[in-house]
Amino acid sequence: NEICQHLGSNGWIYEHPVAQDYDREKAIYTPDLISWVQEAWPDAWESLQSKFGSRAKDQLLSAVRRELDQKGTLEVIRGGVAVFGLRSDLKLAEFKPALGLNEEILKRYKANRLRVARQIKYSLHNENCIDLVLFLNGIPVATVELKTDNTQSIDDAVYQYKKDRQPKPAGQKPEPLLSFPS
C-alpha cells in the first residue's frame, strides 16, 4: 500500500483496493486509453466516431492490442499505432519536450495518465494476480511482485515470474499482459 499511496500522492492515479476497469483479454486499462485519446487527439477520436459510431472504442482497442502483439510495448509507446480509419499513426504517449515552447506537445504531455493498480487478475485461464501493474495511458508498462522481508525473498519473486507467470500456458492462448512479440 505504501508504494501505491506514494505514487498516488505524486501524480499517479491509484484506486484502492483494485482496478475494476482492466480488460484481461486485451491487457489494457480501457478508460485511461480512451480518455488519453479523447484529450490528446480529439480530432482523431472524432474521426473514429464519425466512421465507426459506437464501435469506435472497439476499433481503437483492437488496433492497439494488435500492434502490441506485433511490435511490443516499447515500440507502440514510442511510435504509436496504425488505426484503420485514421490517416496517420496515433501516438499513445507524449514525452516531456526538451523545450516548453510547443503548447500542443506540452498539453499532450500533461494529459498522460500514469496509473498504479494492485492485484490485477491478468489471466484468461485462472484467477492469478500480479501484485502491481504500472500503466501509461492504459498500456501496461511494468509489473511488480511484492515480497515481505519477513517471509519471502527476491528469489521467491524470481521463481514466481519464471514458473507461475507463464506467458503461454501449456495448450492455451498466450496471456496478453505477459506476452512479448517474437
Language-model segments: residues:
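An alpha-helical interface "stripe"
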Residues: 1-182
